[in-house]
């Protein structure tokens, strides 16, 4: 029987007390949920310390308790801040660290850890949170031998039966397929389950695994083919700046292949999709070929034509292309008050005029004090840029044009004090 000061018992008492203290009239609001999450992070800190002291089983059991407590809390607490999700992610990482370590220890510890994960994954707390259930079960794969793998698959069968009649079950089915594949791969080896992998390339994670395998084997043509197939399938509907995007994955394949021309081609494509980070990538690639100065104006022109004005304007600031930046914010003034700070020193009159036109339109559309405050905030910014004369002109103009907007006149008085 565990002592009262055992890590798991401490975790139970601390989390229980925190939930009780932060439950108000049966409800756990935003700030209360954050308070509980901070206490859970403290428990995970203790788990990390225990792990460093080689108290692996204690750390693992407490990590798992924190995870299940979080999942239960997610069903009724207000996690608007996202702190609860952060705790879950950290708990899963620590569980993974523990299972990877325990997998190298004696059979009894492996069996205990596997049994605990399977027991916890069955709990109703995970109903409706299948992604976390499958993530937890994935941490158990490294603990399995052929016999225990069969037990894990039997458990997966029961989960699959539960969702057979569920209309919103495709995601769960994919999770099941991926988890089974990883289990089979762990037991049999990658080569033995290659057909299983390629039979499920419609699942994005399976395709990513196939790309990684091909790249590791230096089969860059295969990795390229796998990426291009998915990019074509997406048909331009998806692009994010995350490493998991297929255009970014393809660029990584080209980087590992060492083929400079393809690196440049793909980096340019990603830049023109609006990812400004690839401006520096292209710059380095062109500089290595000694062609940067000739390619730069061509690239700027293409970026301008791509219609990703925010990306284009950000690059112009980076390259100190102030004249082109002035032209760009004249055409598209959405981010004027951010980029004006880079222009006002060299082009004061032009900047003041652009700001004045922007503020006039802003004031014309404003209908309440909250919006009038934004107008006056921009007027005050104009004053900071030494555009006092323009600001005074606008204040006088607004007072004459909108004499019945008492809230506006009230806010304008605050601006006049700064003139």
At which residue positions do the language-model features occur?
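Eukaryote-biased, non-catalytic alpha-solenoid scaffold regions
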Residues: 1-419
């Amino acid at each position: 029987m565990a002592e009262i000061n055992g890590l798991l018992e401490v975790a139970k008492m601390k989390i229980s007390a925190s939930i009780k203290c932060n439950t108000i009239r049966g409800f756990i609001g935003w700030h209360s949920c954050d308070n509980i999450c901070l206490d859970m992070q403290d428990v995970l800190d203790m788990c990390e310390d225990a792990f460093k002291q080689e108290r692996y089983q204690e750390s693992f059991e407490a990590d798992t308790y924190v995870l299940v407590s979080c999942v239960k809390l997610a069903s009724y607490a207000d996690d608007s801040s996202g702190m609860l999700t952060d705790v879950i992610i950290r708990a899963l990482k620590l569980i993974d660290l523990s299972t990877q370590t325990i997998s190298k220890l004696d059979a009894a510890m492996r069996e205990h850890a596997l049994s605990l994960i399977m027991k916890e994954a069955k709990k109703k707390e995970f109903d409706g949170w299948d992604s976390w259930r499958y993530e937890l079960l994935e941490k158990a794969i490294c603990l399995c031998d052929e016999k225990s793998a069969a037990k894990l698959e039997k458990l997966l069968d029961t989960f699959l039966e539960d969702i057979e009649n569920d209309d919103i079950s495709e995601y769960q089915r994919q999770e099941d397929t991926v988890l089974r594949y990883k289990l089979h791969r762990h037991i049999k080896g990658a080569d033995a389950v290659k057909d299983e992998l390629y039979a499920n390339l419609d699942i994005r994670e399976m395709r990513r695994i196939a790309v990684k395998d091909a790249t590791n084997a230096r089969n860059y043509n295969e990795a390229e083919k796998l990426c291009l197939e998915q990019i074509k399938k997406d048909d331009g509907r998806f692009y994010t700046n995350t490493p998991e995007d297929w255009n970014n994955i393809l660029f990584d394949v080209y980087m590992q292949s060492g083929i400079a021309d393809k690196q440049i081609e793909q980096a340019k494509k990603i830049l023109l999709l609006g990812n400004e980070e690839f401006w520096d990538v292209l710059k380095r690639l062109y500089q290595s070929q000694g062609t940067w100065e000739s390619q730069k104006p061509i690239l700027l022109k293409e970026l301008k034509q791509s219609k990703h004005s925010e990306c284009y304007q950000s690059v112009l600031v980076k390259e100190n292309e102030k004249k082109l930046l002035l032209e760009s914010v004249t055409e598209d003034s959405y981010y004027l008050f951010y980029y004006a700070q880079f222009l006002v020193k060299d082009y004061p009159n032009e900047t003041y005029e652009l700001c004045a036109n922007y503020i006039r339109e802003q004031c014309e559309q404003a209908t309440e004090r909250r919006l009038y405050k934004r107008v006056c905030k921009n007027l005050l910014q104009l004053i900071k840029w030494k555009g006092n004369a323009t600001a005074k002109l606008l204040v006088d103009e607004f007072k004459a044009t909108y004499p019945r907007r008492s809230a506006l006149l009230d806010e304008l008085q605050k601006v006049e004090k700064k003139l």
